[in-house]
Design a protein with these regions (language model features):
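Short glycine- and acidic-rich boundary segments immediately preceding or forming the N-terminal edge
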Residues: 1-50
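Second-shell loop/turn segments in exported
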Residues: 13-18, 69, 127-131
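Active-site-proximal beta-strand/loop segments in catalytic clefts of secreted hydrolases
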Residues: 43, 66, 106-109
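Short beta-strand-to-loop junctions in surface cap/lid or active-site-entrance loops
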Residues: 51-59, 67
């Protein structure tokens, strides 16, 4: 199967458009949580949950997060397409899951997603807060980075 065929087969159809919020992804996360792979790892400024999804048992650790800027949802859609591939039970997926451990945060900035802005509810660009760590979302990202110890990170 080539990449285009995989895309057609595993594209997540339930999330479309550019406005992606927790309300859009929570049903998907509930469906994916068959083996306790989904959990809340923190809260946003407005006390919205920040979810993680973890899958795989490989030695190489890959950390992925999306919507650090709430109005940038393309990666969220791509992330769920990729999660569908990983859950496909295909030979490719099985090889990936034996090689890698994936840790994903589908929406790091749920308040920004809801307000459709790059900033969080405190009007802070989380991408500019990675050193100061003044925001709860930035702290969650750093805590997971330090505890998961990824070999590769994708934002």
């Amino acid at each position: 199967m080539n990449l285009e065929q995989m895309f057609q087969q595993y594209k997540e159809q339930s999330i479309q458009g550019r406005y992606i919020t927790l309300e859009n992804i929570e049903p998907l996360l509930q469906k994916l949580n068959s083996n306790n792979q989904v959990s809340v790892i923190g809260k946003s400024v407005l006390e919205k949950p920040i979810y993680k999804y973890q899958i795989g048992a490989g030695e190489t650790r890959i950390f992925l997060w999306s919507q650090m800027h709430g109005n940038e949802s393309t990666t969220t859609k791509a992330l769920f397409d990729f999660i569908n591939v990983l859950n496909s039970k295909s030979d490719f997926a099985e090889k990936m899951l034996h090689t890698f451990t994936f840790y994903a945060i589908p929406i790091l900035n749920p308040d920004g997603a809801r307000l459709y802005t790059r900033e969080n509810a405190n009007k802070v660009d989380l991408n500019r807060d990675s050193q100061n760590l003044t925001q709860p979302e930035s702290k969650v990202l750093r805590e997971i980075f330090e505890s998961f110890k990824p070999d590769f990170c994708f934002n």
